[in-house]
Amino acid sequence: MDEMAATQASKDPGAKFYRKGLDAMKAGNYPVAIVQFAKIQHSYPKSPLSEPSQYFIANAFYENGKYEQAVLQFNDLTMRFPNSRFLCESLLREGQSFVRLNDRIDARLTLQKLSSNNNCSDESVAANNMLKNLGSD
């Protein structure tokens, strides 16, 4: 957990769910992590922990091999939080999810969107490498 999230978590009513979710993520118990982070989404949607919780839900689905659900959750994050500090990572993971689903068209579109984002330098490099590997149809 980063310092900003730790500070927010200590004051937030959803902090106990956030901590339990992070602990479950670290332990590789992704279904439990999803449940804990979802409690924040449902009970405290305006919480400062809502944004990182959304990211961790999406990431937990990805890590658990549930790529369709991951795509939906990463997309939800980018729609709900268009200026998210997790935007670049989310677009990359969404593109990776599409690749895992063998959806080359949506993978390419997502990775191109990421590649053209000037604020995502590290992730743009990864996106460009993935685009090269996808080739052209």
Task: Describe each PLM feature range.
Residues 1-137:
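Acidic, polar-rich low-complexity tracts and alpha-helical solenoid repeat scaffolds
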